[in-house]
A protein has these predicted regions:
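Solvent-exposed N-terminal domain segments of exported/luminal and surface proteins
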Residues: 11-20, 80, 85-90, 94-95, ...
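Active-site core of glycosidic bond-cleaving carbohydrate-active enzymes
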Residues: 472-476, 480-502, 558, 582, ...
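Alpha-helix capping and helix-loop boundary segments enriched in small/acidic/polar residues
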Residues: 91, 171, 203-211, 465-468, ...
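Extended glycan-interaction surfaces of carbohydrate-active proteins
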Residues: 414-463, 502-550, 607-608, 658-681, ...
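Short, solvent-exposed loop/edge-beta patches enriched in aromatic
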Residues: 95-111, 124-144, 177, 187-192, ...
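Helix-terminus loop motifs that line ligand-binding clefts
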Residues: 25, 118, 123-184, 489-670, ...
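Short amphipathic alpha-helical coiled-coil/interface segments
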Residues: 389, 396, 400, 421, ...
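Acidic/polar, glycine-enriched structural segments that form the non-catalytic walls/loops
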Residues: 4-73, 182, 187-190, 195, ...
């Protein structure tokens, strides 16, 4: 029995090791680059619109200049800064950190860059003091190689100029597949091969670990020569974010940290007045020697630390107090291991940051980050986070692999897509994202069954440069990712908008477009955004003051459509849980009428019978923190909570149908997401969204036993469907609007796309019309524009003589742009219709240009032009690529 048991244990251990190797292996797909990679094309934002495009915007430009001056005098930056725009750096890799606790960027060649520690505010600094350093000693103890593990650059007159990168950039290979990355260093000339595996805890359907602000670096060190090698990896880091004045004001001090089997070093400081600690940790193992330095000068030459490592391969903890020339402070953590020939070992490092409380410049309120629910808000949790990350990162990788592997192994999907679908998700964590605890909304305490009490408040920017939280007309596209991967965050966001719909904010502002003085927000309409992080988001909503968004024609309909889509997805996930419990192991579904008993028991609240009855409500969900279970929002409870707001905004939108034909009309003003591309009368875009919203309202009314509402919406819908065909269908496609009949709009089937994601079929758009319109868009907007290598141009004008080619619509800047988010949504629509080749060509041409030609990885812009330029780097809308995956999986189910 003993021998048999030994064999069983051996087989089991081998199997586990094989499984681990498969999970941690460098994937075949992802962004793959050498450190010396150079892209063939470099673009910028220095676009010069044509005279025709510029003239209508002259009054706006004058008002913007005055507004810009006013904001600058308040020591703030405009939420959309058109004078100082960032150009893409062609350097970024997978960013560090979970969701909502701040992020630190990484370059694909090893840099630490693009800090978002101040909530929603990006600092585009490359901090040279933040490095990994390798030191290799031979069997005699002589140092044979020492180098930075980042790309080489000349720094002869810069700080830390004695630190050198001696690696061969052509022999260093990066693979990025968000949220993980791998970097291979070929140091075989010195008998060593290194692989750094970077892991951030971003895990679908997980609401605990996904919020942890940290990243793990596993350095696999392999001795590939015939004699012993002693290898050290040193991790260095400085205070702050690379912004000199702010860093100097932070009052940085270093501390040694120890927690369980983790040793490390930390920096306590303030960033923009908010306490924050950086924590570097390493797993303690008998065969690893760990040494620490609590003070080196990041503004000096770096000679002392560099020479110490070269001499000893370790740090001298007794003499690590190098004098500081400035208020900047650097710390270092070194792990050394001895390797016999042909052996390997992992050195496990972690970087964690702890900024539990944040404020925005107006300082109306102090907010607490969501991760503190699982640690605490003391500001002393850095060591605990480090220990937690080192303990659980293997499990994170298992969950990430289980999520990604089915897509990576799907032979029906093109190779480029397997990189794009995951790497575009970078924006979920690195979109200026915040995830906060939430106890109130617009001054009112949340009820016990409000999902925000359990899942907090979620916000992400429209773009790194377009600094508005949860911009709703754009989130409409991007929400495909959130609703399918973190549906409870989508639900939480929707509750914020539901509350905002019911709020009047009557403080007035001048609209930059026409100079009118108008209120910030009026009741019964969906706000454009939830505020600027450089002002006071979630209180001062609608920071967008270019146009009067209280009368935009697409915001209300987009809220209604998202409500029904969320309901549909929640039901889908419930069914998936029933069919495959292991896939959603962190989810439990609650469909009880009330969870009040659970609430009072878990929180040990004592209530009288009257209080108990008064507070009893139909529950949506409740998180039981004592056992860590996570509940998914009940679909019907969600629908009930959202329906009154949906009804209110639909009644508001009905007013936009001036001629009672069942279609809302645009007003020859910028009144939808294409805010320079003016529509007049019924338009394919807004009318389509309106009819789709009517369709979903009719169904919601039926589900909630509201027959009168159902009949009302159905009557308007029937009228509108007839008008859509009569006024906007020309036999080949849906015209842009009734005054621009020759323009083919790439986004003309947006309403149909959303209905399909909600499980509808051809209730509004006849199948033959859909196929014909998609063919026209593909032939003209895609293949007749840059030969199909740049996605779909927004507008294309057909020639009056069909045999002659048409041309791009140059009416406005936006009509000649390609919007990646719209292109991905269009591709999803094609896949919905079984047009797989066309869909993947449409999206693939665009993605290959972004990743292979112009190097816009992990900073996808809002818009691209045919040549030379792009607009608004790091944008939310391209998350719509996840609607392609949803469409693919549903079509695959039909085929199977």
């Amino acid at each position: 029995m003993t021998s048999l048991q030994s064999n069983v244990d051996s087989v089991s251990a081998n199997y586990e090791e094989q499984q681990k190797n498969e999970i941690t292996a460098i994937p075949s797909y992802g962004l793959k680059l050498k450190f010396d990679h150079v892209w063939p094309e470099k673009r910028n934002q220095n676009l010069r619109p044509s005279l025709r495009q510029t003239l209508p915007l002259v009054p706006l430009a004058c008002r913007y200049a005055a507004y810009y001056w006013k904001v600058s005098r308040e020591n703030r930056r405009c939420y959309m800064d058109y004078y100082y725009m960032e150009n893409g750096k062609q350097m970024y890799g997978v960013p560090l950190g979970g969701i909502g606790g701040g992020t630190i960027g990484r370059g694909f060649a090893g840099e630490f860059c693009r800090f978002q520690m101040r909530p929603g505010m990006y600092e585009y600094n490359v901090v040279h003091a933040n490095q990994f350093i390798v030191t290799i000693k031979d069997a005699k103890g002589c140092t044979i190689f020492q180098s930075l593990l980042s790309r080489s650059s000349s720094r002869s007159k810069q700080p830390l100029n004695t630190w050198h990168s001696n690696i061969d950039d052509s022999k260093c290979t990066y693979t990025g597949l968000y949220p993980r990355a791998w970097t291979e260093y070929d140091l075989t000339a010195y008998g060593v091969r290194l692989i750094c595996r970077q892991i951030s805890p971003v895990i679908p359907h997980d609401y605990k670990d996904s919020c942890v602000p940290c990243a793990v670096f596993v350095w696999s060190v392999e001795n590939v020569c015939a004699e012993e090698r002693k290898v050290s990896i040193t991790f260095t880091f400085k205070n702050g974010t690379g912004t000199k004045k702010q860093d100097a004001e932070g009052g940085a001090e270093a501390v040694l940290i120890t927690q369980g089997n983790m040793k490390g070093v930390g920096i306590r400081q303030k960033i923009a007045g908010m306490p924050c600690s950086y924590n570097l940790g390493c797993r303690v193992l008998p065969e690893i020697s760990i040494t620490r330095c609590t003070q080196f000068d990041p503004c000096g030459t770096g000679e002392q630390l560099w020479a110490e490592l070269r001499e000893n391969g370790q740090l001298n903890e007794k003499h690590c107090d190098e004098p500081l020339k400035t208020k900047d402070l650097g710390v270092a953590l070194c792990a050394q291991v001895a390797l016999k020939q042909n052996t390997s070992h992992d050195l496990e490092f972690v970087l964690a940051w702890d900024m539990p409380h944040i404020e925005f410049p107006k300082k109306h309120k102090t907010y607490t980050r969501y991760y503190t629910k699982y640690f605490d808000a003391s500001g002393e949790c850095g060591p605990k986070i480090c220990e937690y990350a080192l303990k659980y990162y293997n499990n994170w990788e298992k969950l990430i692999d289980a999520w990604q592997r089915p897509i990576l192994n799907d032979d029906g999907l093109p190779d480029w897509y397997k990189s794009a679908i995951f790497n575009q998700l970078y924006f979920i964590s690195d979109g200026g994202t915040i995830w906060l605890t939430c106890e109130s909304s617009f001054g009112k305490e949340l009820s016990f069954d409000d999902p925000r009490k359990a899942y907090g408040r979620f916000g992400y920017l429209e773009g790194h440069e377009y600094r508005m939280y949860n911009t709703y007309d754009v989130h409409f596209y991007a929400s495909s990712a959130l609703s399918h991967l973190w549906p409870n965050l989508q639900v939480s966001l929707q509750y914020d908008f539901r509350d905002a719909i019911d709020v009047d904010l009557l403080d007035t502002r001048k609209m930059l477009y026409d100079g009118k003085i108008l209120p910030r927000h009026t009741k019964n309409c969906v706000p454009h955004d939830l505020g600027d992080p450089d002002e006071e988001p979630f209180t001062l909503i609608n920071c967008y003051n270019i146009h009067d968004v209280n009368h935009w024609k697409d915001l209300n309909t987009k809220f209604v459509l998202q409500v029904y889509r969320d309901y549909y997805v929640l039901n889908e996930l419930a069914q998936a849980q029933a069919d495959n419990a292991s896939k959603f192991s962190s989810i439990e579904f609650i469909d009880k009428d009330s969870l009040y008993e659970m609430y009072t028991q878990d929180n040990k609240r004592k209530n009288s019978a009257d209080e108990k009855q008064q507070n009893r409500k139909s529950a949506s969900l409740y998180i039981n923190e004592t056992n860590g279970k996570v509940y998914l929002m009940d679909a019907m409870a969600y629908l009930k909570a959202m329906y009154p707001a949906c009804k209110a905004i639909m009644e508001r939108s009905i007013e936009y149908d001036k001629d009672n034909d069942g279609l809302i009309e645009n007003t020859k003003m910028p009144d939808q997401t294409y805010d320079t591309w003016v529509m007049e009368g019924p338009s394919a875009y807004c009318a389509g969204l309106w009819l789709a919203a009517l369709q979903t309202m009719s169904v919601m009314a039926t589900l909630l036993d509201q027959p009168n509402d159902c009949l009302r919406y159905q009557d308007i819908l029937d009228k509108g469907k007839h008008s859509l065909e009569e006024k906007l269908w020309n036999g080949r496609y849906y015209i842009f609007d009734v005054h621009h009949k020759d323009t083919i709009m790439a986004d003309q089937l947006c309403g149909h796309w959303y209905l399909k994601t909600c499980g509808f079929d051809y209730e509004i758009y006849p199948k033959e019309n859909v196929r014909s319109a998609l063919k026209q868009v593909y032939d003209n907007n895609v293949m007749s524009f840059q030969d199909g290598t740049l996605g779909a141009v927004n507008g294309f004008i057909v020639n009056a003589e069909p045999e002659k080619p048409g041309h791009v619509d140059y009416t406005t800047v936006q009509s000649e742009e390609v919007w990646p988010g719209v292109t991905f949504a269009l591709a999803a629509t094609m896949i919905q219709e079984g047009m797989f080749e066309e869909g993947f060509q449409t999206a693939g041409g665009l993605y290959k240009t972004l990743s292979e030609r112009i190097g816009m990885n992990y900073e996808t812009p809002e818009a691209l032009y045919a040549e030379k330029h792009y607009r608004s780097i790091g944008y939310m809308r391209p998350l719509s690529i996840w609607s392609m995956q949803v469409s693919w999986e549903r079509r695959k189910t039909l085929r199977d």
